[in-house]
Amino acid sequence: MAKGAKNETVETLKAVAVAVAIFLAFRILAFQPFTIPSSSMEPTLQIGDYVIVSKYPYGWSRHSIPFSPPLFSGRILQREPQRGDVIVFKHPTDGIDMIKRLVGVPGDRVQFREGVLYINSQAVPRERLSPEPVRTEYGTLEFDRYVERLDSGKSYVTYDRPDRDPEVNNTPVFVVPEGHYFFVGDNREDSRDSRFPRGYGVGYVPAENLVGRAEWVLLSWNEEASLWKPWTWFTEFRGDRSLRRL
């Protein structure tokens, strides 16, 4: 190989390496995209939403890095999340990505009574909205809707069917341990979250497992959209859900 061609190849490889390094640094330190695979956060997030998650609000842990290599423990520049934040975290048992709403911080006492969320013995204020038909695996069902307002200033809409599952609508008091957090889905009847032990739900989530805070729904498609059917990229696009701040 001529010297000039060899130098050109080396420079090209250097440029590629720099580009990859910049991409990885951006993904680890700043922002990362996620897709929503389940209905557990409806109506806030729906299957097919493409969400942008910021990686820096709570500092960084090994779970900020792809494949969660055991390079260090704990968090670097740790900052506390707020109740009401929508957060991506690693499941404490199997390490899969989860997205739920934070309602309990260390020391909090969390409980559900007749479907009402209580934090430290105080009922979270909520306003009833008109019921909404929701498509589920059991067909279209009518869900109650409520606006919950946390003391952090966050408000959001939840789905609820208090007549369906007494186990999730009437719980024991959960005392959140130090260094852990308590998460629930906005779709209270279809979310395996901190109300359930890790074998079925997620239990208490260690601070180290937090990945980042969901900021935007960037783009969104209906469930019928398919990578292998290009026309559905347009026919199933949900423009009304795109570019939405969370």
Residue ranges and their predicted role:
Residues A2-V10, L29-T35, S40-L246:
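Soluble "head" domains of membrane/secretory-pathway proteins
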Residues K14-L29:
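Hydrophobic membrane-insertion alpha-helices, especially the h-region
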